[in-house]
Amino acid sequence: MATILVLHGPNLNLLGLREPGIYGATTLADINQTLSEMATKAGHHLQYLQSNAEYELIDRIHDARKEGVDFIIINPAAFTHTSVALRDALLGVDIPFIEVHLSNVHKREAFRHHSFFSDVAQGVICGFGATSYELALQAAFKILGTPV
């Protein structure tokens, strides 16, 4: 059984309420529930953290190494375009990760096109709404050698 950490960045606590035309009507609790069901079926354990504070996400990444977390799925949200510190934390713990986004960041404002994570991630999944997380989890299962 692998442990997979799912990190949700700033403002994702407002999913379902904030700009539903861009981010959809699905709540963060709904996303986490779906992922938990998928992980249970595959025999894995998921941990979650949503934070609007960069340092909390960094601390959780550091703790993941100590805890033996096997994989990270991260939606850095607005930190995608600004956080060298989060990038360095992920590189520092040497845990494979997938970057995920609900919206297609490449169809949005130009400042959203740059990511500090995509060049060091196992992969990037964006533009499929809440399904982006499910696709990321399926990819994590494959990378970990688990049947999907």
Swiss-Prot record:
Family matches, as InterPro entries: DHquinase_II, DHquinase_II_CS, DHquinase_II_sf
Quaternary structure and interacting proteins, as annotated: Homododecamer.
Pathway: Metabolic intermediate biosynthesis; chorismate biosynthesis; chorismate from D-erythrose 4-phosphate and phosphoenolpyruvate: step 3/7
Residues flagged as site, Transition state stabilizer: R18
Record protein name field: 3-dehydroquinate dehydratase
PANTHER family named in the record: CATABOLIC 3-DEHYDROQUINASE
Protein's gene: aroQ
Catalytic activity: 3-dehydroquinate = 3-dehydroshikimate + H2O
Record-listed E.C. numbers: 4.2.1.10
